[in-house]
Amino acid sequence: MNDIILKSLSTLITEQRNPNSVDIDRQSTLEIVRLMNEEDKLVPLAIESCLPQISLAVEQIVQAFQQGGRLIYIGAGTSGRLGVLDASECPPTFGVSTEMVKGIIAGGECAIRHPVEGAEDNTKAVLNDLQSIHFSKNDVLVGIAASGRTPYVIAGLQYAKSLGALTISIASNPKSEMAEIADIAIETIVGPEILTGSSRLKSGTAQKMVLNMLTTASMILLGKCYENLMVDVQASNEKLKARAVRIVMQATDCNKTLAEQTLLEADQNAKLAIMMILSTLSKSEAKVLLERHQGKLRNALSK
């Protein structure tokens, strides 16, 4: 079995030695960080070639959201942690339920902070993980793995596929096993890492950028922003409360006093406060109009 894995790894771009960093252990501190920076410049170029697939994925995710589905990330190690990170940022940023976007990491909660031996090879665990959240055909599953061959992720994609759910893969190797399974394959080919096989570097950066696009673009299309303002932000701490005031002021060109007063009346709902100020409607009237337009502030204001 080890020989099979060894042979499989030897064909992966992410496992190749980077000729630019062969002498990295002899370089100065400045030379090391300069080389890392130069290599990181390849990441957005790799993502640029994936934009059609990313765009298609976003459109499908939005459709699933509109039909009551969820976005679920699965991954092991760095890939799993990035999924958990992106999912955890959605509720405070966009005011959505913690159930709408979820990240699942091989090995469970403990694996977020500590490595869990054998977790990425446990194909039965992912079935339990997905079944425990009642994953269904209405949901979208995004499998994340730089190698494109992680058993935990592959088994998860196969399970989701068997239910009829949309599957998306994110890998940094071309024509991966994951890509063969997924309905939409996003392949961020960033090349060999400066430390051979350390896919937490360029590959991890590429994954984070793609996840940023999937959730942010989806939420924009769902009406979670007005202009470029996060109007559904949850004012759960002092910084976010101040941000909500600024958002209302920027969207309406009103003064701080009016913004604070209207936010108080609108139960700290920035979107509703903006609607009330710009439309001069009462709280209840503004709320009804927003609901009529599925929470899309721009559409509601145009009527």
Swiss-Prot record:
Pathways per UniProt: Amino-sugar metabolism; 1,6-anhydro-N-acetylmuramate degradation; Amino-sugar metabolism; N-acetylmuramate degradation; Cell wall biogenesis; peptidoglycan recycling
**PROSITE patterns for this protein:** GCKR, SIS
Signal sequence coordinates: none
Q: Which Pfam families match?
A: GKRP-like_C, GKRP_SIS_N
Q: Which GO terms describe its molecular function?
A: carbohydrate derivative binding; carbon-oxygen lyase activity; ether hydrolase activity
What are the alphabetically sorted keywords of the record?
Answer: Carbohydrate metabolism, Lyase
EC numbers, comma separated: 4.2.1.126
SIS domain residues are 61-224
> Record's superkingdom?
Bacteria
- Active-site positions on this chain: 89 (proton donor), 120
Self-association or partners: how does it assemble? Homodimer.
| UniProt miscellaneous comment | A lyase-type mechanism (elimination/hydration) is suggested for the cleavage of the lactyl ether bond of MurNAc 6-phosphate, with the formation of an alpha,beta-unsaturated aldehyde intermediate with (E)-stereochemistry, followed by the syn addition of water to give product.
The similarity annotation says:
Belongs to the GCKR-like family. MurNAc-6-P etherase subfamily.
PANTHER family for the chain: GLUCOKINASE REGULATORY PROTEIN
The record's HAMAP family line, in alphabetical order, gives: MurQ (MF_00068)
UniProt name for this protein: N-acetylmuramic acid 6-phosphate etherase
Native organism: Haemophilus influenzae (strain ATCC 51907 / DSM 11121 / KW20 / Rd)
This chain is encoded by the gene named murQ
